[in-house]
Amino acid sequence: MSHRARHQLLALPGIIFLVLFPIILSLWIAFLWAKSEVNNQLRTFAQLALDKSELVIRQADLVSDAAERYQGQVCTPAHQKRMLNIIRGYLYINELIYARDNHFLCSSLIAPVNGYTIAPADYKREPNVSIYYYRDTPFFSGYKMTYMQRGNYVAVINPLFWSEVMSDDPTLQWGVYDTVTKTFFSLSKEASAATFSPLIHLKDLTVQRNGYLYATVYSTKRPIAAIVATSYQRLITHFYNHLIFALPAGILGSLVLLLLWLRIRQNYLSPKRKLQRALEKHQLCLYYQPIIDIKTEKCIGAEALLRWPGEQGQIMNPAEFIPLAEKEGMIEQITDYVIDNVFRDLGDYLATHADRYVSINLSASDFHTSRLIARINQKTEQYAVRPQQIKFEVTEHAFLDVDKMTPIILAFRQAGYEVAIDDFGIGYSNLHNLKSLNVDILKIDKSFVETLTTHKTSHLIAEHIIELAHSLGLKTIAEGVETEEQVNWLRKRGVRYCQGWFFAKAMPPQVFMQWMEQLPARELTRGQ
């Protein structure tokens, strides 16, 4: 599996996560939203139940206060009428009874001869408060009511009055709990004290049990608490309601993230960004192709050729990425990278081999200013390399602006660096421009060299270039030499310097230096 295929395979889970994350997040938010809403509703209902209980207790106190002001004979028709008139003004009081302790004597409706004695109260508080929960007495026969006694008067209350609240939730259940007697004194019809009892002590929490959600709220005024429950299905219903809004937002978020990811990926995988990363990670490397003096059969130097190893192992040559660097304004960065690496690779070697040189390729923009000269001077001084050991090549098509480039070339030459026109013959230079530029070397392009020993007429161009170079006193270097016949042809016409696979391919720096050390044992003209 290729590196790229592996990268794409590993990236697939990330892409899936990126697309699904906003949708999953929207589901989660919708659920939290629904849960919070149901929880708030439960706590609101519980608080309403407490408030309702507080109101009922308040009414019971008011009834007792009003009844205590009666000054006449008790359990007479007048007394009964007085009690009846009092309870008519209070919604949640069903009956009012006159009593002495737990001996109930008469109510607003009945006055038995001897009254009725009730079992001891469930709750007593000094000085005179008693509460009887779920008692079925002759005063309210057939119904289990709550009897709240203060002093001599007992308010009779329907247990449902304590906490009954209005709701659109048919599954809503509730109960009100006395924390002293540990008794539920009010329960909705469907509620079970056995179910509520283990949960009432979970203060200020919402819990899930047996398909229901439960919430409890404790009173800050009295020793009572309320618990409210609703079916878990209500949470699901709220979840679906919120999902109508949350899911489209999640899908939209997924689309936005996907588009953003595609944009970032496009930018990340763009040729410009790839080249930038290659420079930052020092992935570009230099190979060195020997330049041979075919008269002495010695290697006099090498051309530094920039290579970019691709992700799948292929090596890209400058023709593929230098135009990109020029277009994206990165060419100065490339040039500085090459110069730094040339001296890092061969600086020490050149310092100890004064008869060898390295030729560095430059772009047209490098000849628009003299910026590069100062950088080269600093490197030659740092490595103790002579200026004559560094030569520069620029392609012929770069010399379109002769007036602008001529003074820069002159500055290079005055600093001791020779300048060569690369790939001469395939561009637009004419004799006048060639004289004006005042370069040192002409390099014959490979496209002409490969036709030298064929019957094609293009070899005549090579002969013309050689004659032109001789007439101007320029050195010539033939590129792309691959056969001994080409070497002989060039030698006969006075070409002294060649490079190509016939002599050696471009090599990494360490291999090149080893090759140079073993050079005396080779016969160059045999292409070893």
UniProtKB/Swiss-Prot annotation:
EC number: 3.1.4.52
UniProt-recorded name of the protein: Probable cyclic di-GMP phosphodiesterase PdeC
Organism listed in the record: Escherichia coli (strain K12)
Keyword field: c-di-GMP, Cell inner membrane, Cell membrane, Hydrolase, Membrane, Transmembrane, Transmembrane helix
Signals that turn on the gene: Expressed during transition into stationary phase, at both 28 and 37 degrees Celsius. Expression is RpoS dependent.
Functional summary from the UniProt entry: Phosphodiesterase (PDE) that catalyzes the hydrolysis of cyclic-di-GMP (c-di-GMP) to 5'-pGpG. Cyclic-di-GMP is a second messenger which controls cell surface-associated traits in bacteria. Overexpression reduces biofilm formation.
An individual GO BP term: regulation of single-species biofilm formation
EAL domain span: 268-520
Origin: domain of life: Bacteria
Gene3D superfamilies given in the database record: EAL domain (3.20.20.450)
Main location: membrane
